[in-house]
Amino acid sequence: MQRNGLIGDTIRSLGFLSRLPLPQGWFDNTDDSLPRNARAFPLAGGILGLLAGVALLIANAISLPPLAAALIAIGALAAMTGALHEDGLGDTADGFFGASTPDRRLDIMKDSRIGTFAALTLVIWTSVKASLLMAIIARAGAGYALLALIGTEAASRAGMLAFWHALPSARPGGLADSMGQPQWETVVCGCGLGLALLAIGFLPSGGMVALINALVLMTVVLFGFARLCMAKIGGQTGDTLGAAQQIGSLAALIGLVMAL
């Protein structure tokens, strides 16, 4: 069993990013750290997107309305990941907009309770993502929505990887800080994989325009979010990494829908 290749990295990335049952043998007797395995984050994301897309296809095949199919896909993603990234998005919203100092913002982000800003953000985010998936189903078909989920979930985790590399840790001793940061080579590999899967997911329905739209929007919004993180807390935390993934996924879907 080749534990240290890309397949092993993908399985270990799935182990970190999801709650899927995975063979324990892939996690034993390996010295690989998460920042190195992170090159496979986009592949893990693509697998999660594929599974969510299958749920969407099944819902569509039994004649559920597009809204129900879209919400089932979103729910499947949250169930598979334990709402890991959604939790980060909510905590980030509470911390950034519920306090006036960096230390207080970080304290709020560690609090497991959900606040007003988190609740509003998650409701709005879910509504917008569902409407975008509905638009893809209506304009292109459920099969293309499946491909879009593969591309979106892969590319957004590549964006998260670049975000993680680019920003310093805002909370010494926190989860993100204790894991270290991915090296440049890891980021390049991960972004290449994310771009490949984004192309596979978007080109069949939206063509090159969709791909360019998604890349431009993801770059702009993640750069803006990085600037916001530096201004609010002086860097990144595990919560902001999750938020970056969520923001990137929404930006990519918007780029596709604009091209349909």
Curated annotation (Swiss-Prot):
InterPro entries attached to this UniProt entry: CobS
Gene Ontology CC terms, in alphabetical order: plasma membrane
Superkingdom of source: Bacteria
Membrane-topology annotation of the record: Multi-pass membrane protein
Role: Joins adenosylcobinamide-GDP and alpha-ribazole to generate adenosylcobalamin (Ado-cobalamin). Also synthesizes adenosylcobalamin 5'-phosphate from adenosylcobinamide-GDP and alpha-ribazole 5'-phosphate.
Protein family per UniProt: Belongs to the CobS family.
Protein name: Adenosylcobinamide-GDP ribazoletransferase
Lineage, highest ranks first: Bacteria, Pseudomonadati, Pseudomonadota, Alphaproteobacteria, Hyphomicrobiales
